[in-house]
Amino acid sequence: MNITLLKSKIHRASVTEARLDYIGSISIDEKLLQASGILEYEKVQVVNVNNGARFETYTIATQEEGVVCLNGAAARLAEVGDKVIIMSYADFNEEEAKTFKPKVVFVDENNTATKITNYEKHGAIF
């Protein structure tokens, strides 16, 4: 039996751009992708903290520092300045799942990583 777990998370990033006319995806600062362990073209779930919208797309790495840009149809689901949580998931067998810990990246208002951990404590905001 396989179990799907949170693999990686970029927590409360600020949307810096929304480009409706661009081919669909989410462009993310490559430093954030590397810090989180999310790969370019990996499927991600994006949750908009401001309006509750949830959607899936794939990532595109950008060398532009601090960029989190929603592209294509996803651009209708957030406004510049909205806070989003970007998550990827992976399948594990039962034994792997018992010991796996996700990588969680906390960012500041400029989308610069401030803390990287593999643990989230309920009720704590880093």
UniProtKB/Swiss-Prot annotation:
A GO term for molecular function: aspartate 1-decarboxylase activity
Key word Metal-binding present: no
Active site: S25 (schiff-base intermediate with substrate), Y58 (proton donor)
Pathway membership: Cofactor biosynthesis; (R)-pantothenate biosynthesis; beta-alanine from L-aspartate: step 1/1
Cofactor requirement: pyruvate
Role played: Catalyzes the pyruvoyl-dependent decarboxylation of aspartate to produce beta-alanine.
Family as reported in the entry's similarity comment: Belongs to the PanD family.
Protein name, as recorded: Aspartate 1-decarboxylase
Organism: Campylobacter jejuni subsp. jejuni serotype O:2 (strain ATCC 700819 / NCTC 11168)
Lineage: Bacteria, Pseudomonadati, Campylobacterota, Epsilonproteobacteria, Campylobacterales
